[in-house]
Amino acid sequence: MNKQSWLLNLSLLKTHPAFRAVFLARFISIVSLGLLGVAVPVQIQMMTHSTWLVGLSVTLTGGAMFVGLMVGGVLADRYERKKVILLARGTCGIGFIGLCLNALLPEPSLLAIYLLGLWDGFFASLGVTALLAATPALVGRENLMQAGAITMLTVRLGSVISPMIGGLLLATGGVAWNYGLAAAGTFITLLPLLSLPALPPPPQPREHPLKSLLAGFRFLLASPLVGGIALLGGLLTMASAVRVLYPALADNWQMSAAEIGFLYAAIPLGAAIGALTSGKLAHSARPGLLMLLSTLGSFLAIGLFGLMPMWILGVVCLALFGWLSAVSSLLQYTMLQTQTPEAMLGRINGLWTAQNVTGDAIGAALLGGLGAMMTPVASASASGFGLLIIGVLLLLVLVELRRFRQTPPQVTASDS
């Protein structure tokens, strides 16, 4: 009898060429977007010397992403998904070229940066939604947990590498190099994506796009299982906004500039460990209960984080949060894909991703408000323990999610 390993199995990259193409394209895309993410705030700060105008660019791009996720969900359920992915990526690349040309002007336009940020945020979201909706067809629903864990590792690795490369480019060549390489990387991602098979949506009656989107909302609200998963995801994303308190807590712990970096690295490190040790998650008989408990544990870790007497213990709490939130997120992703009808995958994935965007923004705003009334320690603890109380209530209320059972997939020799 073969025993399933705790470690993540990377065999999907060998056995599924289409997923391998997506993996490669996603990694290049994350690095490209990381170059952009470093360049835009630096350029606006250099042009205006205003942190408010820097924040405005983030807000505008986030708003465009939200709209793009809504529209992308409808398009992914209505049109051939490969075409939507390719169109979105190519259109994003055009926007990056625009940013590069604008940066080369003697006097770059701030308005152009904002407008191109709206452009890129919108079209990037279209591709994300279509790709999520297409994933079950690329790997099979029985491999979704494994695919999600590999994707999480890709995102974490790319998110670590790209800011470092972006910073070096800024120091040596200026923002135009960042934009130019981001555009080049985006167009390069089209090469592996062209090898994907056709990904048609399931046949369904034609209806007005708004009516189609409302149908997705109704399904989300009417399904205790899928709706509960989305709600937990939003709360978990709110908890991750604790990073806005890092500078203030660093002062409280009297941390040096070098030590502050450990706070920012702790959650990604914990999440990477969670993804690497997710080998048995797909074989859990009660994934809903495990999701609820791991979410509660992550809230407790945030509540304890601010109370730690030493910063190193705070880092341990953040790493624990990263690990538990990775477990919860992987279970959310897998259950959402398996419990959503094929005809609804685009819209539900769009709504699920959108709540991640809004949950982070709401969490940051709430923590900012708490920070104005409380000490940083009290703000962090209040947010964590407040979410823990809500989580306990959801553990009692979300009966269908708590009691959900699945038949674990059969373990083969290749899985060991």
Curated annotation (Swiss-Prot):
The record's section on NCBIfam families has:
PRK10489.1
Q: Which Pfam families match?
A: MFS_3
Its placement in the membrane is given as: Multi-pass membrane protein
Name of this chain's protein: Enterobactin exporter EntS
- Read off the Gene3D superfamilies from this record: MFS general substrate transporter like domains
Task: Write out the topological domains of type Periplasmic.
Answer: 43-55, 105-109, 178, 240-256, 308-313, 378
Source superkingdom:
Bacteria
Q: Which family does it belong to?
A: Belongs to the major facilitator superfamily. EntS (TC 2.A.1.38) family.
Q: Which HAMAP family match?
A: MFS_EntS
